[in-house]
Regions:
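Active-site environment of divalent metal-dependent phosphoester hydrolases
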Residues: 1, 21-25, 45-52, 88-94, ...
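N-terminal active-site segment of His-dependent metallophosphoesterases
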Residues: 1-34, 47-49
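Active-site neighborhood of phospho(di)ester-bond hydrolases with catalytic His/Asp-centered motifs
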Residues: 14-19, 38-45, 129-132, 158, ...
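Glycine/small-residue-rich loop that forms an oxyanion/phosphate-binding "nest" at active or ligand-binding sites
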Residues: 50-72
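Beta-strand-turn-beta hairpins that frame and shape the catalytic cleft
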Residues: 69-91, 123-129, 199-206, 236-240
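Binuclear metal-dependent phosphoesterase catalytic core
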Residues: 72-75, 169, 175, 186-259
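Active-site-proximal segments of metal-dependent phosphoesterases and phosphodiesterases across multiple
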Residues: 126-175
Length: 259
């Protein structure tokens, strides 16, 4: 259904921010059927619980140039897309056995250096998007904070430190327009309500959590809807951000406008 709806709504690019397949190559292969420029960072569930790293490597090979990790892509000379640490599970800094098997024992400091090295290639007069699976630390420690731990006490900031440090360093030399991520589900555990999914910092950087879970739902008539986060840039500036529910015909049936 996702492929069909994307062909109807026709975004300029599609960003996948992880937890796509639980390591299933069959699902990952479907991304290559999308005839829209796509960029993919894998999430902690995509590691496949395979400490050899083979499952992760297979996904990386299938995705080819669509795969993003610690690097910068410049799309159509229109936008910079900087990618974060792959397969992050949040909680400060943690490198899983699967990621170590593929990339080696990368320290938090090394991860920051990789971000900053890649960011040097950005085109200054173009917008910069930082895409990650888990968001950065420093955005709140309440259970409903945009990256707040909600599933058990003590509640705390569950964002990635290396990402936060890199953002702070890059902001010294240029604006980061958007940091987009997922991982932390919108619906909180223990019936605590819903998470804050949007934030703007003092530097004007927008933080968007796209983890609307589940992404599919039906209405009282049995009609199926699917969720996408939608961002529009006009003249190199963000003009619109929303969480949208689309029908199978590509119509917007529900929309939560965030900006």
């Amino acid at each position: 259904m996702d492929i069909e709806i994307l062909s109807l709504i026709k975004p300029d690019i599609v960003l996948f921010i992880g937890d796509i397949s639980d390591g299933s190559i069959k699902i990952i292969k479907k991304i290559n059927l999308i005839n829209i420029p796509s960029f993919v960072i894998l999430g902690n569930h995509d590691r496949g619980k395979d400490s050899s790293g083979d499952t992760l490597i297979k996904q990386i090979r299938v995705l080819g140039e669509k795969y993003c990790a610690w690097d910068l892509n410049i799309f159509n000379n229109q936008i910079n897309i900087l990618s974060a640490r792959p397969c992050s599970s949040g909680g400060g800094y943690y490198l899983s056995k699967e990621v170590k098997a593929v990339y080696g024992p990368i320290s938090e400091q090394d991860s920051v250096k990789k971000f900053l090295k890649s960011s040097e290639k950005n085109i200054q007069n173009l917008p910069l998007i930082f895409m990650a699976h888990s968001g950065p630390s420093g955005l709140g420690s309440d259970p409903n904070s945009i990256c707040g731990k909600d599933w058990k006490e003590p509640y705390c900031d569950w964002g990635d430190r290396d990402l936060a440090i890199a953002i702070s360093e890059i902001q010294k030399t240029r604006k980061i327009d958007l940091v987009i991520f997922g991982h932390m589900h919108n619906r909180l555990k223990r019936n605590q309500g819903f998470r804050k999914m949007f934030k703007i910092d003092k530097k004007g950087t927008v933080y968007l959590n796209s983890a609307i879970v589940p992404r599919y739902k039906t209405n009282s008539k049995g009609e199926l809807f699917v969720n996408f986060s939608w961002v529009e840039f006009v003249e190199n500036k963000i003009k619109h951000i929303s969480h949208r529910w689309y029908s199978e015909s590509g119509e917007i049936c529900e929309e939560e406008i965030l900006f």
